[in-house]
């Protein structure tokens, strides 16, 4: 029997969090390659610590990339531009250790096979207009508003920050927000009182639906009392360490593979995007109110070795019909995914902060619901509706 009354918590981090800085630099490298060479192969990792950035990986491309310039431009855009923030785009060292992709991998990928083995998941539900779980969507809303407020002139804020939102569910539906945690890097001179007032008024009040907040909602702002040292000075940043923030906030499984810094021949990324595309269209079609899709691949093999659809008991037709409809409507080879979602465009740096899913920008092609009618027809839902 599924749990019906519970609290579920998800977290998000800002673009100035050190791990997200690493993700954005890795994806900035990927975008730079794709602008010049759409067939380039990229597996780029970034590490940041006080005063330096290290870019490493396997990149095979005709493109000419100025890695130090690219890294500094990304850090500058994020907002680290002076030493008092703990990191300065203008003075940081940039180390580069980049080699080419192994020809052993390339021989399988070049013929259309998957770039690695592994399993990937996609998830969707009807809790929010974006068909995302409510906790992660609200957590992202808070961190996005933190960055927006900082850029709009709330100069007591610094780029590093995190949010955590606990949502209360009754009968399996989100009904209220129980707890909001916001931890934000700040100027040393600001008082706790001023910071708390600013975050409540300029961030939380603008980011979260008023109907879900009540007098019992707990709001915790910088619970340790101080957050001056942040960014790479406070914590080492590494690509691929925020994979739950990147996806569904823990509501929905994860295959373990990170996204950022990987070109779409890597199914860790492209098949996870396709999984989201499928799950979202299943829910949008009215076939289920929750849907999780798993696909799995073998390295060098084009077709997935398995496809699974789980609707958690919410399906309007037998799950077997939905699974067959998925195979009928969607191409699941790496080449079909890349072509179907138009993944050879330089659109990835935007994905590297505030979630890869649940976004409304047109460049996020895996968020379209343009297959819902075809899915409903293939699964026989339109016939059921006609009879009813």
Swiss-Prot record:
GO cellular component assignments: cytoplasm
Species name: Anaeromyxobacter sp. (strain K)
Keywords of the record: ATP-binding, Cytoplasm, Magnesium, Metal-binding, Nucleotide-binding, One-carbon metabolism, Potassium, Transferase
EC number: 2.5.1.6
List of residues binding ATP: 17, 160-162, 226-227, 235, 241-242, 258, 262
Membership in a protein family: Belongs to the AdoMet synthase family.
Top-level taxon of the source organism: Bacteria
Classification via Gene3D superfamilies: 3.30.300.10
Residues annotated for Mg(2+) binding in this entry: 19
EC class (word): transferase
Protein's job: Catalyzes the formation of S-adenosylmethionine (AdoMet) from methionine and ATP. The overall synthetic reaction is composed of two sequential steps, AdoMet formation and the subsequent tripolyphosphate hydrolysis which occurs prior to release of AdoMet from the enzyme.
Cofactor remark from the record: Binds 2 divalent ions per subunit.
Subunit structure: Homotetramer; dimer of dimers.
Record: residues binding K(+): 45
Cofactor: Mg(2+); K(+)
Matching PROSITE patterns: ADOMET_SYNTHASE_1, ADOMET_SYNTHASE_2
Gene transcribed to yield this protein: metK
Official protein name in the record: S-adenosylmethionine synthase
Residues given in the record as L-methionine binding sites: 58, 101, 235, 266
Any GO MF annotation of the entry: ATP binding
Region described as Flexible loop: spans on this chain: 101-111
